[in-house]
Amino acid sequence: MKQLILLFAMLLIVCSCSDEILNEDNHQAILGASNVTFSFDSITSNGNWKLCSFKQKFDACQIPDSLLSELTTKELVELCASHPLNPICYAYNNPMDGAQYIMKNFNGFKELQKREDAAEQLLDFYEGIDFINVTNSPYPISLKGDNNKVYSGSNIQFIELILASGELPSLYNKTNMERLDRVSYNKFEQKLVRNDTYGVISLSNSLIIQSQVALKSNKLTENDRGIIRNFYNSCGGSSDISTISKILYK
């Protein structure tokens, strides 16, 4: 009987989880007098967060409709970077599939896609990430961006997958693509400097961005294009990174 009562109590907690976390008052409590108009912190710090199902957590992380249009593009980029469920990308055989799930279902990214300055702000954010002065290395690592804001390694990996995804077409106009090529190469070099910290996955992410740029620019030979296309489609799983880097950086 005691076991049944305990089980019933646990079910009540889980069932009430989404109601408590999704409560509009909870979202409004996140608002403050600072420039930050939305944050995931108050959602994930809720005592019931760990008891929620994945769907309940994902629903809880949606930005209230009343706030979406009020957020700046920079804030939307930062929210995409700090989404608490970003690590699920690497629960998929192909991490891009996980990233696509978040991009297609998170209303913050959908709003970002509508912004004319989305590509510029995304590039500004990524360019501001310091891959050399890493904290909490070797794992889990934390990386600093502009204004010394701290992001987990998985947060930045998600941004790299966005940059490579093709979901923001304006990233691939001539001006932005040249900048994306330059910035992603610089970040790859920064990671190589800290080869005691960054492994194959992180290095592959840089090369996946570079692969997308190379495929869009039509500068590859037919044979190289096939190799790079396979590398991109497998999200880094089809070839070793030394082979890919030799092709991309000829």
Where are these regions (language model features)?
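Generic cytosolic/nucleocytoplasmic N-terminal low-complexity/intrinsically disordered segments
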Residues: M1, L22-D25
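Sec-dependent signal peptide recognition
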Residues: K2-L7
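Residue-level signal for mature regions of secreted extracellular proteins and peptides
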Residues: M10-L11, I228
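Non-catalytic all-alpha helical scaffold/repeat segments
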Residues: D25-K250
